[in-house]
């Protein structure tokens, strides 16, 4: 992966300038003020320890005037394992470029995740699960996240486990509907469910 020299970064947005000037110091401030992240460097500065995992690499055909062209399609999840997660997709002729595009999009899609101890079987009050039952949908796939007591672990498919772990969720039950073999829709449905923990009005 290419490394960006943040000292050379010239912000193109007002939010970017505020971050580079040190007027916004935490990622929490961004979401508390309803800012929209349009530059991945903002995430690089405020969440330098962000982890990333490739969920899927596919070869896809693209029709052009010169005929069919092959491209790599990559799905990536990013997260700090402590309440922030993002999912992105990238397409390019080279795998490396597709990964970089996917990581960039995942950073721009970063969302806060509200965690809690929502299971009636557990009363530890620690942020190890989701605080309430929440759903997310993408394409034909619908995912329901159900609070689980401490020690249950992530009762979910492999793709969902990665996204949940990167978000900092340690215990949860899941229910799924639709074609979960479609990695992008499965990952995005989980992402949307996690996003809904933050934006859901209690």
From Swiss-Prot:
InterPro entries: Ribosomal_Su5_D2-typ_SF, Ribosomal_uS5, Ribosomal_uS5_arc, Ribosomal_uS5_C, Ribosomal_uS5_euk/arc, Ribosomal_uS5_N, Ribosomal_uS5_N_CS, Ribsml_uS5_D2-typ_fold_subgr. Residues 50-113 form the S5 DRBM domain. Keywords: Ribonucleoprotein, Ribosomal protein, RNA-binding, rRNA-binding. Signal peptide: none annotated. One of its GO terms (cellular component) is cytosolic small ribosomal subunit. GO terms for biological process: translation. It comes from the Archaea. GO terms for molecular function: rRNA binding; structural constituent of ribosome. Gene3D superfamilies: 3.30.160.20, 3.30.230.10. PANTHER family: 40S RIBOSOMAL PROTEIN S2, RIBOSOMAL S SUBUNIT. The N-terminal domain interacts with the head of the 30S subunit; the C-terminal domain interacts with the body and contacts protein S4. The interaction surface between S4 and S5 is involved in control of translational fidelity. NCBIfam families: PRK04044.1, uS5_euk_arch. Part of the 30S ribosomal subunit. Contacts protein S4. Belongs to the universal ribosomal protein uS5 family. With S4 and S12 plays an important role in translational accuracy. This is Small ribosomal subunit protein uS5.
